[in-house]
Structure formats: structure tokens, C-alpha cells
């Protein structure tokens, strides 16, 4: 810290009167005070430094509160604006994870936050607010408590209290402490507080984004689905084998940081000798291997289980880095007994070097047809498919069953499929499968359930139950939140398909790291910042350049901005949100977008400007 900043902090200390002061002192008293100061011990000096930092931060909080009082009406009425004028600010980021980054990706892969499915701030945190003050206000006593906690922790650290005066460390500590306090408040809030809130008028509907209004050539979604960014020197590998449900098999296993559902494509780079040797030993063209999800919590009665999917390789290519690029497709759900694992399983995204085997059991998929379709009405069955006779035919069917019509329709998946089809029309997706089993997995990937519901749908063996869970979420309006600081980033209604596989796709970067990416037309105002320079190198979408985007509040990597570089290519601009950096939560109608951290934003902005 330079002399000007140090002088600033000492000046702020003057703003807070010392306890016990009686007024001005004469020269003799001042000389005595100076002499006394020179003789203080090390403990008193450390206490003085603590007081300087604490007083400085308290003064910033006071100024932030005054600014809040002036801006409160505007903040309560706004949605998505944080009152910031620093649109061009580019937050510093020590760990940047980009679509084409190399060493940064390897470092990012080692962090639990990139792989957590149960990180601080669950899927319901966004709907828990204190009903008494406005939802965007954080009480000053919590900010004061955060300051005290930060100073106490710094005092016990090796750097001591002086470590707080480093600009980057200072800002990071404020973020960390305030975020932890906010998450603790969300987890410990009583459930009754949320239920006692009076009903609120829902916000006006947002205007949908229609890419058809853009003039130009529509991007070919087959290019992204084929993962053409690895080149055109790949060859098809024959064979798609489904294993018998309930059977047990011995196979090669890897780990993965995301949940895969059957039907998803998993691209990856790996040492080719691991796969080629396995193919030669088994005499298989399209090798089947297992992928486990260690961060998906098993049921409480079976804690020693690892759930995953079988994957089969269907295409092979060369990456040019002594690694081989493979494309595989998830086929069936599996369960692994951890006691049967032979060797140390490794993550498939981290260039595994060792083989690991285990027995895996293929999980069943139970599907019950709709009750009314199981009733044979004899010669009257010919009227079933006549639209004008359908209602009358249904009434005749009901008379032959002991169940009322509502009970039969409750387990009808046709209505769920039709509602889902209408909701997905805005995403421009026309690849909905017809098989109920494949359809249930496809809807999970494209309707974007919360992580808790995703685990529930994966663990259930009943296709009907899976569709019922999906149907219960069709009316909810959801938002992408930053996994690190809980700031809202984008509306799920702005999702669209840049791949023929849907709105959520797995992509592999040049370093071998696999990203689960959600493509959206737009993000919220003032939600993101940028890091690095845009580039077209190794772009997942040919004809587009990518640029790393960071959460504007916590400066963590949350995805990429893609901008068309070829003329007349549409959409001209869109965003890819990294699944490891975002979570899905319900939209809170009575809370301004990004408003829960309004006070903290003002504080951090003021701290940053004061320390520039």
C-alpha cells in the first residue's frame, strides 16, 4: 500500500472520536502523549492497528448506509441494476477457466467448487428472506459483525492485521466474510418466516427474445453437436449395445464432476492406450465403460453406493497432443458397490493414467402405460382415435373402472408431455424423443430442474414418477444464480438450443476439461464482467469468438460470451453459462434482481474506490 492510501486510512480514523476524550489538549500534554506512544509495547501497537482498520471499515459502512438511504427508493423499484457506473470494470481473477484455456483449466479442475453439486447456498436459498425489512437490505449489525470477524481472523493469521491493508486481500476478505454470513442466515432462517409472507402480485411478463427477428444465416446446430472444434479427422466406431436390466458386469470405470443422464453425449480426451488396449482385450469396437458421479448423494440406507451411467464410444479422433479425442454417449443408469472397486478411480476430465475396474449393476426402467389405455373396450376401441368421439369414449371407459376420472388422469403422461412441449417451443427445440424412457431423461436436461430434483429423478427407477416430478415444475419461473455469491445472472426462459441435443451440452476444451454449458440469449444487466481478450481459437461454435465472463460481484468465472465473427450469422451474440459455476433457483417475485446484496455491493464499491 502506498503512502497516500495509508494517509487515507489514518484520516478516516480521525472521523471516529476516541473514547474518553475531553476536548483539545495543550502542547505539553501532546508531547507527553508522543513520549508515551513511543514506549508502548508490541501488543498495544497491534491493538492500534486493529482500531485503525476497524474504524476505517466502520466509516465506510456508515457512508454506505447513507448512500443506501438515498438510493433505497430507486433500488426497490429496479430489477437487475446495482446502481453501478463501473460497467467497464474488469475484475481481477487469479483462476480463469476459459473455453480454450490450458493451465488455468487444470488448476480449476482441482477445486471442489468446480465439481460441487451441494455447495453452500442450496437451491432454495433464493426464496428465504426476512419479511420485516425490505428484501434487499442487510442489517448493519451483520455488517459490523462481519468486520469484527474479519479483523479477528486477520489478527490470528501469519500476516497479522497489516495483511488486511493489501488491496486484493482486503476486498477478498470482505467478500468471503459477508458471503458466509449471508449463507448462514439463509440456512438458519425459520421456515415459517417465508410462509408468513403475504401474497405478492407477480411481476409483469418479460418480453421474449425472438432470434427469428435477426437477419442472417441461422447457425447450424449440427456443428456444435458433432464437436467439430476437434477437427474433421475423426472416424465412426460401430456398435450400440444396451445391457440387460438387472445384470452385473465387470468394466472400466471413471469419475465425472457432472450428472449425466442417458442420451447425453460425453466428449473427452484421454491417453489412447487406455482405451485401445481395452478394446483389443474385449474384442469390441465401441467400448462400453462406466462413469460414476461421486458428488451425487446416495440414499441414506445405502451410503456405500456410487451411481453413474454406462457410456459407449461411438467416434474416435486425434487431438494432436499425444492424446486421443473420443465421443461417447450415455446409455443406462448403473449402481456400483464401492467395495467392489479395484484400483483408484480417476476423473475422466483430468487425463487419467491408471485403469480402474469394478462390478456395475444395470438399473431397471419401469414404465406403466396410462390406465385408460390399458382398458380393452372391444369393438368400441375403434372410436379411441376419433377426436370428436374421444370424450364420449373416455366416459364409457371410466364406467368400467372403480376409479374416478381425475385419479386416472393424474397418472397420464400425455398431458405432461404436451405442457413440456409448449414450454420448450420458445427454445426452438424440435428433437423431443417419443419413447417415454428416453423422453423422461431428455426433459430433465432441457427443462433445467434444481439439483435436488435432478438427484431425485436420477435415483428413481419409475419412468412415471420421473415424469410426475418433471410435471410439478413446469409452472415455475427459474433463474440462474452464481454458485459462489448467489447473485442472479440470467433467466431460464432465455435458454435456447445451439446444439441439436438441446440447451445443455457437455463440451471439452483444449486442456481436456469438460464443461456442462447452458446457452442463453442474454444475461441480466450489470451481472457480468470480462476477463482476458476474446479469441476464436478452439471455439465450440464455429464462426463465433469466445470471451471469458465473470460474475460482476464476486469475480468468479461463470461462463463465456460468444459473438459472431462471420457476417450474417445469427444469433449475433449469446452466452454460455458453466454448469459448475451456476445453480438454478426459483424466481422471487417480490425481490429485485440482485437486490439481496444491494448494501454489500455499495460497501464493496466504496471500499474499492477508496483504495484505488
From Swiss-Prot:
Segments of this protein annotated with the region Disordered: 1-30, 58-133, 181-211
Residues of the CULT domain: 477-586
Basic and acidic residues: compositionally biased ranges: 181-190
tRNA processing as UniProt keyword: no
Compartment list: Nucleus
Pathway where this protein functions: Protein modification; protein ubiquitination
Start-end of Low complexity biased regions: 69-81
Residues annotated to bind Zn(2+): 482, 485, 551, 554
Biased composition (Acidic residues): 1-11
First-listed, main subcellular location of the protein, grouped into a coarse class: nucleus
GO CC annotation terms, alphabetical: nucleus
Keywords: Metal-binding, Nucleus, Ubl conjugation, Ubl conjugation pathway, Zinc
GO annotation terms (biological process): protein ubiquitination
Post-translational modification: Ubiquitinated.
One Pfam match: Yippee-Mis18
Family: Belongs to the CRBN family.
Main function: Substrate recognition component of a DCX (DDB1-CUL4-X-box) E3 protein ligase complex that mediates the ubiquitination and subsequent proteasomal degradation of target proteins. Has an essential role in mediating growth by negatively regulating insulin signaling. It also has a role in maintaining presynaptic function in the neuromuscular junction synapses of third-instar larvae.
Descriptive protein name: Protein cereblon
Species annotation: Drosophila willistoni
Origin organism lineage: Eukaryota, Metazoa, Ecdysozoa, Arthropoda, Hexapoda
